[in-house]
């Protein structure tokens, strides 16, 4: 019975991990797009403060999701990905 429960738990963790990785990937893409928008706004001489504030809030949310992803990876005994910017 315990082996079946562990197997089900692992399957559930795998599913959560997959969904979380999709959220993280999408969030990173949106941040890159927003950075492009901010750059274009600067070139046009527009006020970028609201857009930068939005990016800051989005980065905080992304950090939370990355933490969830890392927790799930550790629970599954997997290697953590390199930190952002460590390419």
Model-predicted segments: where are they?
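Anionic, Ser/Thr-rich low-complexity intrinsically disordered regions
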Residues: 1-87
């Amino acid at each position: 019975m315990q082996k079946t429960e562990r197997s089900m738990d692992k399957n559930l963790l795998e599913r959560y991990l997959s969904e979380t990785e999709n959220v993280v990937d999408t969030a990173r893409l949106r941040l890159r797009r927003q950075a492009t928008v901010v750059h274009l706004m600067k070139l046009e001489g527009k006020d970028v403060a609201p857009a930068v504030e939005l990016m800051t809030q989005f980065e905080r949310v992304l950090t939370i999701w990355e933490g969830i992803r890392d927790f799930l990876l550790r629970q599954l005994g997997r290697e953590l990905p390199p930190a952002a910017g460590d390419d």
